């Protein structure tokens, strides 16, 4: 092989390794605010990314209770808590009288618990690439929405 081809391969490996390494969600220092809270996660038994998100919560200091439910039961939990369907994700977390829908970064949870807004919860819709518990690279800023009484109140924050 010629030197240019070998150099190209080496640079490619370094480049893709750097993307993989730097995209990993860094663990924040455990927040004492989180250690006193019980996060209750509703998820289906077959969801692998939910398991990764639960590990993320635990690594950030949360005490986590997992409730595995059927798809229908999970949908009912979302409906009973008036989470708009267009903001749904694969799991729902309840903590401190709020719901947290989706693969939410701890920065948003910290803001929610610190500011204590008069809302029912926050949502990061769908399952964005690179969000906590999800594989891939972050393709765009995460838009997190406030919800009250079944209504999307707009942007809570962007990360």
Language-model features: locations:
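Positively charged n-region of N-terminal signal peptides that target proteins for export
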Residues: 1-4
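Hydrophobic single-pass membrane-insertion segments
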Residues: 18-29
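Conserved helix-turn-beta segment immediately C-terminal to the redox Cys motif
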Residues: 54-74
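Hydrophobic membrane-insertion alpha-helices, especially the h-region
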Residues: 7-20
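Short active-site oxyanion
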Residues: 38-40, 63-64, 96-99
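Thiol/selenol-based redox catalytic cores and closely related redox-interacting motifs
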Residues: 79-159
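Stable alpha-helical elements in mature extracytoplasmic
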Residues: 46, 53, 70-73, 105-109
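Local sequence-structure signature of Cys/Sec-based thiol-disulfide redox active-site neighborhoods
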Residues: 32-60
